[in-house]
Amino acid sequence: MNSPHGSGLRAVVAIATVAAATLLAGCTFMAVQTAPAKPPAATRSETALRADTLFWKTLHDGDYDGISRAMQAVKGAYLQTPGDAVTAAHVGFLHIWRLAESARQESLSPAITDDAVLARKFFSEAVALDPSEARFQGFLASSMLAEAAIHKDEKLTRQGYFKMLDAIDAWPEFNLFTAGYVMSPQPADSARFKEGLAWQWRTLDECAGTTVDRRNPSFAAYMGLDTRTGPKRVCWNSWIAPHNFEGFFMNMGDMLVKAGDWATAQTIYANAKLSPDYAQWKFKGVLEERITRAEANVAAFNLASRGRGAGDAVIMNHSRFACSGCHQR
């Protein structure tokens, strides 16, 4: 027979154990929550500035094979000054570039998926260090969605999606395009793809300052709005993205073709020719072939494969110039 005193003692011990565990959990929570945030760097080091130079040269040259060399320099600068938001973002971008243009690789290793994880890590650092930079927010959301797609992680997909909506609110001219580009590989009949295409139209509206005619979306009337200052500067070419304008219309045209609206896509593609830098654009031949083959490309663009040749019939997001299309000089 159990002693009533023994039963009572066991109850007291059980309560004490639960209380101790709760207290310990509370202490752990408080210890973590009250830890100081990593402080942003007050200045940028000479090492970081030298790494910047190599980063931009590699990107602007479209030197995909030079990514590893640039990564060494930029990560070295980050380790020296881990509070440098710009350097953290550059590491993230190199990882996302290597993943985005993986069609360039002759033999693709499963290890390429690590670039999505590392891109998210470094863009997370950049956002934490400089939460006011909306471009970092958009890149973080993009990397979250890329990682989620690889791992079939629905929770991370939703987190990335809503973070992207926040990024759009923070800088619509920039992140509406970013968001739509990320959605372009989705099935053409999916809600996400349709939303992504709507975001491209909204980008045009934001940049034009009015609603662009959906039936005849020539951008010729708005070319006088070209600016290098303010939030609308990202609508145009710049030293960061020397062919941003052309690349935008390449992607939007691809999305319209994929959606089956190849006739409107031809007008959208043709807008790229309005750029004063069009003659120097490395991918103008690809765009002109897309105009010619717009109707034939409807079926091709709905395939999920990635292209191997520069002119392969795949959407820009799946091509060898997924980033270089805007950034290569």
Where are these regions (language model features)?
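Bacterial N-terminal signal peptides that target proteins for export
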Residues: 2-16
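Bacterial N-terminal signal peptides
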Residues: 14-25
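Bacterial Sec signal peptide processing site at the extreme N-terminus
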Residues: 24-44
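Extracytoplasmic c-type cytochrome modules immediately beyond a signal peptide or single-pass transmembrane anchor
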Residues: 65-68, 73, 194-203, 212-231, ...
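TPR alpha-solenoid repeat register
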Residues: 87, 136, 174-177, 248, ...
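The canonical Cys-X-X-Cys-His
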Residues: 319-329
